[in-house]
Amino acid sequence: MSQEFEVGHSAVPNAATTTVEKPIASPTTTTIQPPWTKRHLNLILIGDVNSGKTAFLDLLANVCAGVPLEDFKPVHKAANERDSSQPGSNTNVPEFYTISCANGTEVNILDTPGLGDPRGIEIDFQNRNAIVKAIQRHFETVNAIIILANGSLYHTMGVEFVIKTISHIFPHSIANNIAFVLTMVDDPTMIVFDRSYLPDELKDAKVWGINNPFSLWMKYQKKIAENPRTLPEDFLEEMNDSIHRDYPKTLTTLSEVFQFLDKCEVQPMESAYSLKERPDIEAPVPNVIAGMN
């Protein structure tokens, strides 16, 4: 099985482009069923710091391209990632990816730095303006915005700040094109997500929970490559079995996500403008009111 990755820098500062080609088909390839019908999908992944946006991008890129779980590999540009042990967003600048899918369609995804960066409001302000510039460069229309959040944490402040930022960038009509994906969710019935603080326009937004199999598989590969190994063999076997056992559930969830995306009416992006014109966007504070008007 072969994959080809082509990386190029955008002419716009703080934006980059990566193309992910679909692999040669394999009899063991598992894809999203039923397939979606739109030939092109434009998505924006956005969320607070450490919400798992880039890992979710890697999952989408592998699954959409028809790559079997055992062959999962990172597709994100490693040079665009900071040391995860350091505070702040791991993603340096917005990165644009084009994924050639196994069903012949194309998915364009903008991966973005985390909002609410603890390194300070200046970093956060730069990141938000870079997101706007990347949107203006790459998208005339957008199918959906996926807001990611750590589903293992009970928090509202970070997500509220993300929603407030979105409300200042996009037209009011984008509300019907917004959905949530909660990461690090072992059991979908135990999702920690409070809708009460959401603006009325998002009270009925779609919410899905996943425990990203791409992240789990990368951790498993790292553990079995250790010499000497730090985990007992039976633990590693259980880890492998668990990932494979839960993977079909993830495919079911992704199928629901793409059926939602397929039904979204495209939204024009000509009204997205620089946040420099909106100085009223502040750092995240308690009780942020994120009206979509």
Question: Where are the regions that the model predicts?
Answer:
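PEST-like, low-complexity acidic/proline-rich intrinsically disordered segments
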Residues: 1-6, 213
